[in-house]
C-alpha cells in the first residue's frame, strides 16, 4: 500500500491540463464491443480503473493497439464468450465497477452477457436493478447466482420498447442505450440520465451508425439498426478533476489556470463554487482562479444558511460534494452539505475534524460546515483514503494544512487522478509518493 507524504501550507502557481473524463471513458471504452470494425478513442485517462477495463477487454479478445499515451485503437472482431464464465474473468471484473458496462454491448451483439457483482467505491448502496430492469423490458432473461454473486443475461433477439426508469442512473442509462441500438424496432427511453458522459456516448454511437435522437434530454428515441461500424471519438475533459482543481486553488490561496475545460459541459459547477465565495474567471476555454486571501459563503436571500446538494444532471454532481465540503472548512460562514444520492460519502469528515475543521455530521446524508475563515489553519495528520473523491479531498486539505500529513491507501486516488503528485509538484507542492 502506497502513501503520500505532504508538507502543506505552500501557495501554488501555474497551469493544469485536465485529463480525460473517467466516467465517460468507462462507458465509451465498452462501445467497441458493438462492432467488429476498428474504433479509435483519444484523451483516455491513464488511471487505474480505466487501465483495468482496457486489460479486461483485451483478455476478452478485443485487439487493442496503443497509438500513444491516451489514444488507443480497439477492434472487437473475435470475442471469447467462453472466457466470460471463467474464474479469471470473475476475479478481474469483480475488482472494477465499470465492468458492468460490458453487459449491454455483449447482450446486443451476441445475445448474452455475464458479470460478477462489481467492485468500486464503498460509498453506499449502488444497486444494479436499473440495468437489468431495462434489459428485461427489451426482452432479455436475467439470472443471478447468489452463491457465486454472478449475473447472467441472455436474449435471442432484443426488441424496442418503452422504458421509464425509476431512477436516472448514469451507468444504467449507458448500458441500456448500448443494448437498444441493435434492438429490433424503436425504443422510447424516459427518465434517462443526460450527463455530458451520456451525451458523448450517444454522439459516439451515432457516428458508428446508431440512430439516437433527444440527446441531452431525459427522453431518448433509439431506432434499432442491424449493425454498427467504426469511428473516432475524443473523450471530454474530466469535470470532476476541474472542480477538484478549483477547490485546490481556493484552499491553498493559489493562482491557477485550468486549461481546455470544455466550459459548455460544466453546467452549474462554476457557479456552485462561486457561491462559496471563490473567484473564478472564464478565459476562452480556460478557467483562471486568482489567489484569494479569503472567501465568504453566500446565504439564501432570506439570510438562512446556504444548502448545497447533489442531483442528477443538470444538477450538481455528487462526485464534487466532498470537494465543496473541504473548501468550506476555510471559508467565512457556514453551509449545509446534503448528499442525497449516496449514504456513505460523508464519513471521511472525521479525518477533517481531526485536522481541526468544524463540521457537524447530522446524519449519513448531511453535514454542516462552520468555516474557520482562515482564523485557524488545518493541521497535518496521518489518514487513510477511503475512496477516490474523499481521497483527493483529504489531499487538498493536507496541501492547505500546517505541517506534515501522510495519506495512506493512495491507490484509491490513483483510480481517478492521473499523475496527481507529479502535476502538483509542477505547481510547487511539497508532495512525494512513498511505496
Can you name each region flagged by the protein language model?
Residues 1-435:
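Short, structured segments at the rim of ligand-binding sites
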Amino acid at each position: 500500500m502506497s502513501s503520500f507524504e505532504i508538507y502543506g501550507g505552500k501557495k501554488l502557481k501555474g497551469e493544469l491540463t485536465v485529463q480525460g473524463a473517467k466516467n465517460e471513458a468507462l462507458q465509451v471504452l465498452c462501445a467497441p464491443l458493438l462492432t467488429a470494425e476498428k474504433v479509435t478513442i483519444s484523451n483516455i485517462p491513464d488511471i487505474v480503473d480505466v487501465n483495468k477495463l482496457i486489460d479486461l477487454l483485451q483478455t476478452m479478445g478485443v485487439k487493442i493497439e496503443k497509438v500513444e499515451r491516451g489514444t488507443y485503437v480497439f477492434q472487437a472482431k473475435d470475442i471469447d464468450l467462453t472466457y466470460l464464465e471463467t474464474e479469471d474473468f470473475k476475479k478481474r471484473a469483480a475488482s472494477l465497477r465499470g465492468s458492468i458496462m460490458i453487459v449491454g454491448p455483449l447482450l446486443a451483439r451476441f445475445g448474452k452477457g455475464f458479470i460478477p457483482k462489481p467492485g468500486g467505491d464503498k460509498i453506499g448502496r449502488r444497486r444494479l436493478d436499473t440495468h437489468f430492469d431495462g434489459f428485461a423490458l427489451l426482452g432479455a432473461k436475467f439470472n443471478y447466482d447468489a452463491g457465486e454473486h454472478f449475473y447472467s443475461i441472455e436474449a435471442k433477439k432484443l426488441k424496442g420498447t418503452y422504458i421509464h426508469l425509476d431512477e436516472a442512473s448514469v451507468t444504467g442509462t449507458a448500458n441500456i442505450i448500448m443494448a437498444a441500438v441493435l434492438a429490433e424496432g424503436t425504443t422510447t427511453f424516459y427518465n434517462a440520465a443526460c450527463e455530458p458522459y451520456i451525451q458523448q456516448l450517444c454522439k459516439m454511437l451515432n457516428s458508428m451508425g446508431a440512430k439516437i435522437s433527444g440527446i441531452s434530454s431525459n427522453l431518448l428515441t433509439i431506432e434499432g439498426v442491424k449493425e454498427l461500424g467504426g469511428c473516432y471519438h475524443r473523450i471530454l475533459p474530466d469535470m470532476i478533476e476541474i472542480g477538484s482543481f478549483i477547490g485546490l486553488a481556493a484552499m491553498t490561496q493559489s493562482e491557477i489556470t485550468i486549461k481546455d475545460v470544455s466550459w459548455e459541459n460544466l453546467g452549474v459547477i462554476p457557479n456552485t463554487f462561486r457561491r462559496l465565495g471563490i473567484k473564478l474567471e472564464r478565459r476562452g476555454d480556460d478557467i483562471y482562479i486568482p489567489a484569494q486571501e479569503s472567501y465568504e459563503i453566500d446565504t439564501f436571500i432570506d439570510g438562512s444558511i446556504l444548502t448545497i446538494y447533489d442531483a442528477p444532471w443538470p444538477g450538481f454532481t455528487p462526485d464534487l460534494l466532498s470537494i465543496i465540503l473541504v473548501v468550506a472548512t476555510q471559508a467565512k460562514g457556514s453551509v449545509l452539505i446534503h448528499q442525497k444520492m449516496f449514504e456513505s460519502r460523508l464519513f471521511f469528515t472525521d479525518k477533517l475534524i481531526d485536522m481541526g475543521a468544524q463540521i457537524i455530521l447530522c446524519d449519513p446524508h448531511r453535514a454542516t460546515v462552520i468555516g474557520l475563515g482562515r482564523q485557524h489553519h488545518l493541521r497535518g495528520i496521518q489518514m487513510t483514503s477511503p475512496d477516490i473523491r474523499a481521497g483527493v479531498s483529504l489531499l487538498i486539505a493536507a496541501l492547505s494544512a500546517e505541517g506534515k500529513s501522510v495519506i495512506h491507501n493512495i491507490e484509491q486516488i490513483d483510480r481517478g487522478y492521473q499523475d496527481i503528485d507529479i502535476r502538483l509538484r509542477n505547481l510547487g507542492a511539497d508532495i512525494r509518493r512513498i511505496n
